[in-house]
UniProtKB/Swiss-Prot annotation:
Residue spans of biased composition, Basic residues class: 670-680
Coiled coil: 523-561
Composition skew (Gly residues), residue ranges: 655-669
Upper classification of the organism: Eukaryota, Fungi, Dikarya, Ascomycota, Pezizomycotina
UniProt zinc finger (C3H1-type) residues: 25-54
Disulphide bridges, residue numbers: none
Complex and partners: Homodimer. Forms a heterotrimer with a catalytic subunit PAN2 to form the poly(A)-nuclease (PAN) deadenylation complex. Interacts (via PAM-2 motif) with poly(A)-binding protein PAB1 (via PABC domain), conferring substrate specificity of the enzyme complex.
Gene Ontology biological-process annotations: mRNA processing; nuclear-transcribed mRNA poly(A) tail shortening
Family per similarity comment: Belongs to the protein kinase superfamily. PAN3 family.
Name of the protein: PAN2-PAN3 deadenylation complex subunit PAN3
Organism: Pyricularia oryzae (strain 70-15 / ATCC MYA-4617 / FGSC 8958)
Length: 680
């Protein structure tokens, strides 16, 4: 059997308490029983060691100093002739707390190697054989519970010293605070302060993304192609999915509100409240059109409860009482391609002098700059890497609509002064509107130019906008000469000639007017008018379909008001017999059908078909079975329609006002306030 190099018993004895070589040294060596137990029971039985603790141990001579004594010099390994391996130690080990031994000097358990960190000299460390009462407890210099930064330092300390696993007071400061529970607290004053934890960080312009509760259908799956011409699917009874999503998203945008501290910081401006920031860019200082830092908000009017768009000009000071006179002229203009101005006023709600303009609000509207040049304002946008280049058909549509807006503006003796890609919004499919009209008239009221000159500037800005869209070049980097040459190669000569007419100054013999412009593009005006008519026909057809759905809804409300009238249980004239009993069974026939296995049948086609036949009153007979399956009725839809009209007529008479007023007292139902809209 192989033997080890060192005897384990001798090595353990050397580490614990080295035995003196001679009896001459025992009188100065303190007995270990005194250190461990406080007394030695062999003191009077021949123990050769010293038992007097007050007697200090003399400083050992250099010749008798032990190799592994705590007072020995720090071990420094000799330099090897061979290159040593590079050691890797944590950078945080240098800042570790100095270890002070508790009772005895910490002696190494083996021979140190070249890879170990040098032990600092223990010059001020108390001797291992000094008084126990004078020994200092281990106290770390700094408590750091970050495992990522203090892992190396913590590894050099003895974790078993003064550790109580059931005491958490030392780490209480590092533990997270208890989460606020709004349901367990009776005091709800802290609900607002703790409510921000349930939402993302409230930044400027942040809007809540929690959708409202839309109780709308969500069709799943494609259309069936194996239907016969006389067959219909569920989709045929409702509006198209894309139109429904568009309307639903606009409703969602209209109902969005700000949350957290951002909502509390929004003031009430005049008669407008619940302000929501609509700006999509944080670069406010680049507003070169107005010359002021502008902000756009969505707000609710306190007078009409309608939504409006507010544009704020920060730091504008009104120096003339007549500066708001142009607003009256702009409020008279009504055009399908102009965002109508509602009001203008000054406010100090933000602590400065700001000028506010109120316009009509169109949810999910985006500017031409955002739609066609998304990368110009978003350097790291998640949208498409290429701009949305407008085709020539779309360009002619824009030209016709802007011409329509200019015709309405110029005919009233005004100038648009806002034909810019950042001030023209898209509110529908290729439907654009001029926004911010009239703001420059208020700002430059004291520096007004002749109206003919301002209208001429409208034509020039109009031409530059079309060139920018045709060449897919942002307005800031547009080289007009090269852009027109490029447009001539990619587009028709008619479009190029129209743009040159807009950019060139008028001839000496005449003046440029919108009528002259419309006369030159009359062919494209007819094309745009035809597209508008077809769009109107499509919307009307969808409206007709929803009217049919409204008829079904009114019939359902009548059936719901007739069935299960508990307040008339004791009324002999309103007992569930005869016609009313058949209506109750008809409800089960339409909505409570089951299959052969007793599972509910959910067939929208069956429900709509039965309700439509009931609304018309056909002669078709159906069999109504009682719930106990003992009685059957053969009735026609015409008879059921008469029963509905008769029973509902009695309810109208009993209401007292013919419009669904309060029911019999003591029923427990809420009192309904009639209005002119309560018509069936």
């Amino acid at each position: 059997m192989a033997t080890t190099r060192y005897n384990s018993n001798d090595f353990r004895r050397q580490l614990g308490s080295p035995r003196p070589k001679g009896r001459a040294d025992t009188k100065d060596t303190l007995c270990r029983n005194i250190l461990i137990y406080g007394h030695c029971r062999y003191e009077d039985a021949g123990c050769a060691f010293n038992h007097d603790q007050t007697k200090k141990s003399p400083k050992p001579d250099a010749t008798t100093r032990k190799t592994l004594n705590v007072d020995s010099a720090p071990f420094t390994p000799a330099v090897s002739s061979q290159p040593s391996k590079k050691t890797f130690s944590s950078s945080h080990a240098a800042s570790a707390a100095v270890f002070t031994p508790r009772a005895t000097a910490a002696t190494p358990t083996g021979t140190p190697t070249a890879q170990e960190t040098d032990i600092p000299p223990a010059a001020n460390t108390p001797s291992a054989f000094s008084n126990i009462a004078a020994i200092r407890e281990f106290t770390p210099q700094q408590q750091n519970y970050d495992l990522t930064t203090n892992g190396a330092a913590a590894a050099t300390q003895d974790a078993s010293l003064n550790y109580d696993p059931f005491t958490m007071s030392s780490v209480a400061s590092a533990l997270p605070a208890a989460q606020y529970n709004p349901y367990a607290s009776t005091d709800h004053t802290g609900l607002v302060a703790h409510g921000g934890a349930y939402f993302p960080s409230a930044q400027a312009g942040y809007q809540s993304l929690i959708p409202p509760s839309f109780h709308l259908y969500a069709p799943i799956g494609p259309y069936r192609e194996d239907l016969q011409p006389w067959q219909r699917s569920t989709y045929d009874f409702f509006m198209p999915e894309n139109l429904r999503l568009e309307l639903q998203n606009k409703s969602h945008a209209a109902l969005q509100t700000m949350t957290g501290t951002a909502a509390l910081q929004m003031p009430q401006v005049g008669n407008y409240h619940t302000l929501v920031t609509l700006d999509k860019t944080s670069n406010r200082k680049s507003s070169s059109l107005f010359g002021y830092v502008t902000w756009v908000y969505k707000a609710v009017s306190g007078k009409t409860s309608r939504l409006y768009s507010l544009r704020r000009l920060e730091g504008f000071t009104v120096s003339n009482d007549q500066i708001l006179r142009p607003v009256k002229e702009w409020k008279k203009i009504t055009n399908g391609n102009i965002v109508a101005m509602q009001d203008a006023f000054t406010t100090r709600a933000w602590g400065d002098s700001s000028l506010m303009f109120s316009f009509e609000y169109y949810p999910l509207a985006e500017t031409l700059m955002e739609h066609h040049f998304p990368n110009a304002q978003h350097k790291t946008s998640f949208r498409s890497n290429t701009n949305h280049q407008a085709s020539e058909t779309v360009l002619w549509s824009y030209i016709v609509q802007i011409s329509n807006a200019l015709n309405s503006i110029h005919s009233n003796g005004l100038a648009a002064r806002c034909i810019d890609a950042t001030k023209i919004i898209i509110t529908g499919k290729n439907h654009i509107r001029l926004s911010s009209c009239g703001i420059l008239d208020v700002i430059n009221y004291e520096k007004s130019k002749p109206m003919t000159e301002l209208q001429e500037e409208d034509f020039v800005a109009f031409g530059k906008l079309i060139v920018s869209l045709a060449t897919n070049t942002p307005p800031t980097g547009l080289n007009l000469g090269k852009a027109i040459e490029q447009m001539g190669r990619n587009h028709s000569s008619t479009l190029k000639d129209m743009v040159l007419w807009l950019l060139n100054p008028p001839q000496a013999s005449g003046q440029k007017t919108v009528k002259n412009l419309v006369a030159g593009i009359n062919e494209h005006v007819m094309t745009a008018f035809d597209a508008q008519q077809r769009q109107s026909d499509m919307l009307y057809s969808e409206l007709y379909r929803e009217v049919e759905n409204g008829r079904v809804l009114r019939l359902l409300m009548k059936l719901a008001t007739i069935n299960e009238r508990t307040e008339y249980d004791k009324d002999a004239g309103w007992s569930e017999n005869g016609d009313r009993y058949m209506l109750k069974l008809f409800r089960d026939y339409v909505f409570h059908q089951v299959d052969a296995q007793g599972r509910p049948v959910l067939d929208p086609g069956h429900m709509l078909r039965c309700l439509s036949k009931l609304d018309v009153g056909t002669e078709e007979r159906i069999k109504l079975t009682s719930r106990d399956c003992e009685t059957d009725f053969l009735v026609t839809y015409k008879d059921l329609k008469g029963a509905v009209q008769s029973a509902f007529g009695e309810l109208l008479k009993g209401s007292g006002n013919g419009r669904g007023g309060p029911v019999a007292s003591g029923s427990g139902h809420g009192v309904h306030h009639p209005s002119h809209r309560d018509r069936f």
